[in-house]
Amino acid sequence: MLIGFFVAPAYDFWLARQRYEYKYNLAGSLTAITALLASLCAVMIVLHMNAKELSDVANGRLYASNIVSYIVYGILWFIIIFRGKTFFNKEYWKFSLQLSIPLIGYALAAQVLSVSDRMMISRMVDNSAVGIYSTLYTVSSISLLVWSAINASFIPYLYQNIESDKNEIKKYSLLLMGAYAIVAALLTFFAPEIVRTLATEEYYEAIYIMPPIAGGVFLTCVSNMYSNIMIYYKKTQYIMYASIAAAATNVALNYFCIAKFGYMAAAYTTLVAYIVLALGEAVCAHVVCKKERGANYEVYNDKAVGLMAVMAILLCLSGLIWYQYAVLRYGIIIAGCAVGAVLGYRVIKMRKVKQ
């Protein structure tokens, strides 16, 4: 792990630069090749250890897959160091620390926001409730994989155009939000099928916690969009403030609501906490933009973003109704897929134009 902590940032920095320069083919190829080689190496080691009847196969598999990744990361580390020809630069370190130290507070608060509900359910209810809640929380969060990819592609475009007076960022951001809202909603409507496939019948009884969790998870895209602005203007302390407020809200609400309404209440307290996070970061970003660019400047169409966020949450929560009507639910899923395809096509078309 220590070796990984040392060399993995080189890969992250390299990947961020490739995305910023729109070199997705190279980044995607290296990522895919590394993953393939790591998987093949792990399989070969496991088969060899089983054939030799060796113990500790799990550690063998772990070392095999990680060694391949760390070799790739190490090569990139040496390339970056060689090209930079500098190990320590006071100006760079000062800039990085000023930008990153508040984000440590954000990361800690985000971790509290993410796991506090499960820890409190364990203490206030029982471990079986934790198992059910954790499984459905994980399923509800699958859409974050989609948003992570979207956000990674959007950040370079945002930072290259944020100083422009054009309104293209407003249009592009709403398209991306709309596409992600469709993904989050469709995942919510597919909840019965997903839970039946991945879990036992006792988990199915708790599918009604998925809509509020999915609505809260969707708001991650709103908070990320506004936190991107604060990172650009080097005001990361505001990100920390908003995340601490959200984490504190979640812990306080869980303390009272889980005891009174049971573990399912944690899904709704999570939604409220994410609303606090998104709203807090939107307000902070507005304050930062006002200081940096003037009172009337806004990067996004804030009213449209707020309206879309409300609509997305309501759409996710409507799953509480549609779970009882399979035919109507499938009809909504088909319509959502069609709308998602149209939005996805428009996003891809705009991305090609920007490149």
What are these regions (language model features)?
Residues 65, 69, 246-249, 298-353:
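Transmembrane alpha-helical segments of multi-pass transport proteins
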Residues 40-49, 75-76, 147, 170-220, ...:
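Alpha-helical transmembrane segments of multi-pass membrane transport and lipid-handling proteins
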Residues 7-29, 215-245:
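Membrane-interface junctions at transmembrane-helix termini in multi-pass inner-membrane proteins
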Residues 54-62, 71-114, 153, 157-167, ...:
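Interhelical loop/hinge segments that connect adjacent transmembrane helices in multipass membrane
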Residues 55-59, 95-99, 103, 121-141, ...:
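Interfacial/gating helices of multi-pass transporter permease domains
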Residues 46-50, 108-142, 192-202, 260:
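Helix-terminus/linker motif at the lipid-water interface of multi-pass membrane proteins
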Residues 28-83, 245-249, 263-285, 332-333:
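Hydrophobic alpha-helical transmembrane segments
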Residues 136-166, 170-173, 227-232:
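Helix-loop junctions and terminal segments of transmembrane helices
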